[in-house]
A protein has these predicted regions:
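Long, compositionally biased stretches
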Residues: 1-69, 87-90, 94-96, 100-101
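A conserved hydrophobic position in a structured secondary element of the catalytic/binding core
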Residues: 25, 74-75
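Short alpha-helix capping/helix-loop boundary micro-motifs
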Residues: 37, 76-81
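Short active-site loop/helix that positions an aromatic residue
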Residues: 80-88
Length: 101
């Protein structure tokens, strides 16, 4: 069975020269995902997902973030460019998690 979620968040940049770009999941959604995926989470608590933003889909992982008590979704450059999004933009995201992964 595939688990499906959606949320809105602002894109932000990790402050380093070659820093990553992330979306932080809302805490309540992170708690739901944490509970739903407990039996099949990967190393360091990461969760394999398929993410979709503005019609652009990619496979990645959610990474737990103790600072925000949530998960971080990395957004690679190709997706940011194709979706036309930048730092500070409010982004609607759909996530799919397969229990078989």
């Amino acid at each position: 069975m595939a688990l499906k979620y959606s949320f809105k968040a602002r894109l932000w940049h990790y402050p380093e020269e070659a820093g990553w770009y992330f979306l932080t999941l809302p805490e309540d959604l992170a708690a739901e995902i944490r509970e739903d995926t407990a039996p099949f989470r990967r190393g360091f608590g990461s969760v394999k997902v398929t993410a979709t933003v503005s019609g652009q889909s990619w496979s990645t992982s959610l990474f737990p973030d103790s600072k925000s008590s949530s998960y971080l979704l990395p957004v690679k450059k190709a997706i940011r460019v194709a979706a036309g999004i930048g730092v500070g933009d409010q982004v609607h995201v759909r996530l799919g998690v397969s229990e078989a992964d």
